[in-house]
């Protein structure tokens, strides 16, 4: 890298620092109905069964997939 590289990079990013960043104003309504403990438990269980269980099975049988038969 040359000696001028940091100066060039600072010159390119210097103008971007002065630009204003718009602030998003996001508002939402309160939920129509509160989630209960059972709803949350069912949701977490279904996520576990759908995503983590198959990937865990594949990872535990990875050595079997590496073998050529």
UniProtKB/Swiss-Prot annotation:
Main location group: mitochondrion
A biological-process GO annotation: mitochondrial electron transport, cytochrome c to oxygen
Transit peptide: 1-25
Keyword vocabulary terms for this entry: Membrane, Mitochondrion, Mitochondrion inner membrane, Transit peptide, Transmembrane, Transmembrane helix, Ubl conjugation
SUPFAM superfamilies noted in UniProt: Mitochondrial cytochrome c oxidase subunit VIIIb (aka IX)
The keyword Mitochondrion is assigned to this record: yes
Mitochondrial intermembrane topological segments: 61-69
Transmembrane segments: 37-60
Pathway: Energy metabolism; oxidative phosphorylation
Top-rank taxon: Eukaryota
Motif (SIFI-degron): 2-19
Membrane topology recorded in Swiss-Prot or TrEMBL: Single-pass membrane protein
Mitochondrial matrix side, ranges: 26-36
Stored Gene3D superfamilies: Cytochrome c oxidase, subunit 8 (4.10.81.10)
Mod. after translation: In response to mitochondrial stress, the precursor protein is ubiquitinated by the SIFI complex in the cytoplasm before mitochondrial import, leading to its degradation. Within the SIFI complex, UBR4 initiates ubiquitin chain that are further elongated or branched by KCMF1.
Compartments where found: Mitochondrion inner membrane
Entries under PANTHER family matching the protein: CYTOCHROME C OXIDASE POLYPEPTIDE VIII, CYTOCHROME C OXIDASE SUBUNIT 8A, MITOCHONDRIAL
Subunit text: Component of the cytochrome c oxidase (complex IV, CIV), a multisubunit enzyme composed of 14 subunits. The complex is composed of a catalytic core of 3 subunits MT-CO1, MT-CO2 and MT-CO3, encoded in the mitochondrial DNA, and 11 supernumerary subunits COX4I, COX5A, COX5B, COX6A, COX6B, COX6C, COX7A, COX7B, COX7C, COX8 and NDUFA4, which are encoded in the nuclear genome.
Function noted in UniProt: Component of the cytochrome c oxidase, the last enzyme in the mitochondrial electron transport chain which drives oxidative phosphorylation. The respiratory chain contains 3 multisubunit complexes succinate dehydrogenase (complex II, CII), ubiquinol-cytochrome c oxidoreductase (cytochrome b-c1 complex, complex III, CIII) and cytochrome c oxidase (complex IV, CIV), that cooperate to transfer electrons derived from NADH and succinate to molecular oxygen, creating an electrochemical gradient over the inner membrane that drives transmembrane transport and the ATP synthase.
Family: Belongs to the cytochrome c oxidase VIII family.
Name of the protein described by the UniProt record: Cytochrome c oxidase subunit 8A, mitochondrial
């Amino acid at each position: 890298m040359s000696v001028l590289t940091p100066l060039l990079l600072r010159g390119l990013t210097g103008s971007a620092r002065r630009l204003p960043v718009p602030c998003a104003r996001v508002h939402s309504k309160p939920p129509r109905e509160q989630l209960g403990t059972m709803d949350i438990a069912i949701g977490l269980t279904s996520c576990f069964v759908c995503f983590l269980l198959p990937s865990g099975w594949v990872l535990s049988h990875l050595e079997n997939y590496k073998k050529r038969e």
